[in-house]
């Protein structure tokens, strides 16, 4: 079976075409903004403009036509309302035109589900991106969020800090590069509250220290990463201890960070659990993960009526009963 997936929860429009065990195409285009940050209306306009050419490109790359597609999946949420609506409308139009079944997919669940294409069975997932920071795992037939940010996502925190340092957007890779030259750890607020995280205090203090002019930016970048990532690893380790699962996966755009990968790998080795990071194009927001999750849902008998395809800006992972 072949599934087409459309992702458009934020500033990236992605279209993926997959079978049960192979990615046939995975193309995307990301809205570039001067100062970073995303305006929902601009994201929607970007997606609307690029949907047709990107769909054409995906079909060409996969070597298939719309007639060959068995099911159409789309990112139903969580995300920016205007952007989600563009994607849902396109998915509905294609489903009606080509008489195909349609499935709405939870974006956060898809990030973890795509790892199963690579043999991962039942992991704890650390999902880190601009807008999201969650530790989630399957328990009792639903993806439960064991810990999450109480304020801003880790990717957002890195971007804002980079912007304050005059590094531009996206800031994550630039902070990572700068951190490699750090020589000294500077004390910054470490906020783990129960199983949840907070990055706003860390961000505020790091900016304050930078503006004081008393610290090397390399040391601040290094200390920012070490503090934030240690908190992420701590909460992930607690979730592993609680669930007694034997696999941990790292997904989302910030999964590109080599220091975060290294810290998680060390923790996984210490606990004797398997650690996996998908190829980067399947870590970031992408259509292939939506297609793959949608295909698994469809094969398990999940079918959506058109009126059930309404977008959900605040779509929680535990709203979805996982029967696939």
Curated annotation (Swiss-Prot):
Main location: cytoplasm
Domain of life of the source: Archaea
Reported cofactor(s): Fe(2+)
Gene3D superfamilies: 3.30.420.40
Residues reported to bind Fe cation: 107, 111, 127, 285
GO biological process: tRNA threonylcarbamoyladenosine modification
Single GO cellular component term: cytoplasm
Keywords assigned: Acyltransferase, Cytoplasm, Iron, Metal-binding, Transferase, tRNA processing
Binding site for substrate: 127-131, 159, 172, 176, 257
Reaction catalysed by this enzyme: L-threonylcarbamoyladenylate + adenosine(37) in tRNA = N(6)-L-threonylcarbamoyladenosine(37) in tRNA + AMP + H(+)
InterPro entries reported for this sequence: ATPase_NBD, Gcp-like_dom, KAE1/TsaD, Kae1_archaea_euk, Peptidase_M22_CS
CDD domains: ASKHA_NBD_Kae1_arch_bac
Record's subcellular location: Cytoplasm
PROSITE patterns reported for this sequence: GLYCOPROTEASE
Textual note on the cofactor: Binds 1 Fe(2+) ion per subunit.
Oligomeric form and interacting partners: Monomer. Component of the KEOPS complex that consists of Kae1, Bud32, Cgi121 and Pcc1; the whole complex dimerizes.
Function (record text): Required for the formation of a threonylcarbamoyl group on adenosine at position 37 (t(6)A37) in tRNAs that read codons beginning with adenine. Is a component of the KEOPS complex that is probably involved in the transfer of the threonylcarbamoyl moiety of threonylcarbamoyl-AMP (TC-AMP) to the N6 group of A37. Kae1 likely plays a direct catalytic role in this reaction, but requires other protein(s) of the complex to fulfill this activity.
Record-given protein name: tRNA N6-adenosine threonylcarbamoyltransferase
